[in-house]
Every structure is written in structure tokens, then in C-alpha cells.
Amino acid sequence: GLTSSSIEMASKGNLGIEINLSKVPCREANMSPYEIMLSESQERMLIVLENGKEEMAKKIFDKWNLDFAVIGQTTKSKKIELYFNEEKVADIPVNTLVENSPMYDRKWKKAKLPKRIKVDKEQFKTLKVKNVLNKILSNPNVCSKEWIWQQYDHTVMGDTIQKPGGDAGVVRVHGTNKAVAASVDSSAVYCWAHPLSGGKQIVCESWRNLISVGAKPIAITNCLNFGSPENEENMGEFVECVQGLGEASAYLEFPVVSGNVSFYNQTKDIGIKPTPAIGGVGLIKDCKNMVTMNLKEADNILLVIGKTEGHLDQSLFARD
């Protein structure tokens, strides 16, 4: 809602914000200032514009039939000042609600990692590659998801230039040669096997998927799904996953611009595996430079990058 979006932006910018709540579009009549500030509406955004660009923004929103209203301005006061019907109804220092607010300090302990599966290389040598491949490709976590995405129209408005099934979806930007690439990735087993490395890996996977279609990665959002934070090991998984996410995004200069946390995902006190999901977006400056995953011609060269040993301990191959 307006509370978190306005205060967080003011805090990050080291500024204040003045909002006229009488100008906020509301679905219900006679909403109080308290209700307006706490109401959470899906797909509603708060944007800070450069002065003088209001009409330019309005034309864009009008084109797509979206509600748009100028509801306030940034200030140097470092306070959140709210007005309703020409009366000031709140005047609070921003840092009181952000940097200086009380924080949870939950107890946590390092998650107990699952036992490593002993890989018998000699036994694997007796397996038939065809049988192994068929079994792996039939697993729900690996198999084609076409049966899902073929059920909806992924070419609405004719802007899709790379359809589902590749490393990332790509849609063109109207009036330009540019395109936006998007990928959503998650790996619960990896994060369960090693939360710190799993957190790093999921950010890197999003990055790799975007560059694989020719895009420059810009930013990510996350959805962090975990068990009860009151369980110290579950909380430990969360702490280490978030640490991994942070380290990888900082190293790759791939900022996390938004996200949410979902706790208490459990059945009979048994929590789910740590499941951070990452949504990444990137920019392709010229659609002509977009890359697809299919081989282009005979004698294409295939490369393996990085070490290929020591990754089987919790792999689908070893577990199944």
C-alpha cells in the first residue's frame, strides 16, 4: 500500500514526502485517511516523476486506460506529511518508521544440511545413458512445461518475439527496436542442500537465462517462501538464503528492486524446502541481436563452461 511504498522511497532517497490523500483514487467512497494509507490494491504503483513530466506520463497511462493521479511531492523535510480535506492528519519523521523502527531479532541456527549421497562412479558406468535420460526428462521438475503454457495465449497483441520454452521470454517495446526479456527461476532442492550457495545460484540462474537471449540484466524481484520463522533451523535457512541472494546480486550488479516474504508454509509443523523464486528482467537494445536456444546449423560447436565434478551429491540423477 501507500504506507510502505512512500516511506521506503523517502528513506532510500533521504527525503521527505508530502501526500494529499484527497487526490488518491479510491474504489470505495468515504474512506478515512487511515484506510487509504493501509489499503493494499493489486497492481497499484507509486512512481516518483521529474517535475514537468506529469503530462507525458498521463498520456502513457491514458493510452492504456489506467488511472493516474498526482498525489503529492518529495520534500527536504525527511518527514512523511499527510493531508486530507485540507487538514494535516500525520507528520512523522521517516526514519522513525524505517531505520530507527524496532526490528525482529529472531533466534536462528545454521540449518542442518542433508547427508551427501555417495556417488558410486563404477555403478554409474553400468547404466544405459538412454534409460537415465528418459527417467530424468520424465521428472516433473525437469520435463517440458509446454502442457501448461500452451493453455494460455502468450502472443497477445503480437508483441512476443521469443515464445515460452526458451531461456527467457522476450517482448518488444512499442515504437523502438528494443525488447524486454524476463525469466522466473527457483531451485528448492539446491537451497535445501546448501542455503547459502542455493541463494547465490538462483540469482546466477536468472542472470544466465537473460544473457542467453542477448539481454543485459537490469534488476530482479523475489518471492521468498519458507517454513515457520519460529523454527530456528527454518530461520537459519532463510538467513543464509538471503545472504546468498544479496552477495550474488551485489557481485553481478543485479539489484533487487522489490520482493515479498511468505513464512509459515508448512503442514503439521513440517516446513517446505526453502524456495526463493527470482523474477529477472533485462534489456535487448536491438531485437536483431536476440538469441534463441536452438542450434542454428550443422557443425555448431558446444561448450561446457566451468568444472563438471562434485555437483552430483543432491542431484536428481543421484536421488532417483
Where are these regions (language model features)?
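Glycine/proline-enriched, intrinsically flexible loops and inter-domain linkers
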Residues: G1-D320
